[in-house]
Amino acid sequence: IAPPESYSSAFQDIYSGLILNYDEMLDREAVFTNPRLLVIYGNYSDATYLSKVNEYVDWKRQKGYHVTAVSTATAGTNSTAIKNYIQTQYNNTSTRPDYIVLIGDTSGNMAIPSYNTYIDYYYTWLAGSDNLGDVIIGRISVETTEQMTNYMAKIASLEQNIDLSAATWLDKMVLVGDTSSSGISTAYTNEYIHDHSLAVNPD
């Protein structure tokens, strides 16, 4: 198998923190590329909503991401079609996403279904037969244009115009669980995040 001609910078910090002698094992002829982001948004024709989607995409491009943005008219309106679309994007190294963002709740005007009843994580099972995600996925859970407008206002406040000297909340975090029994894995995840957070910021 030929070595890759490029590496995504999305996971560089993770790899360098987990792999011994990471810098020495890299192919020196390969280059790092900016992260790829796949945005799938609910197919809703409201002009304000679409302008806010474009605003989000433009902002991510300004931050250096390679962005592919499609509506569910292209990606599909059911979980199987959406998973197949993501898989096709992943199988092509020129479009393979590092991150996926779904814009739309599972109900409402711009609905996008979850992969099963509760979660989107299965959308990220794209390589191999294991149960580990191969990309990072998130969802902007909005049901109306007003909610999307409010979300973009928060992005402007937190990412574009933030006053770091006054942002003491950056030293805090909240871990959210669910009301059902999720097994021991959630407890391990909380402990892992807690330990690594203390390593970064002991205070």
List PLM regions with ranges.
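Cysteine-dependent hydrolase recognition
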Residues: I1-D203
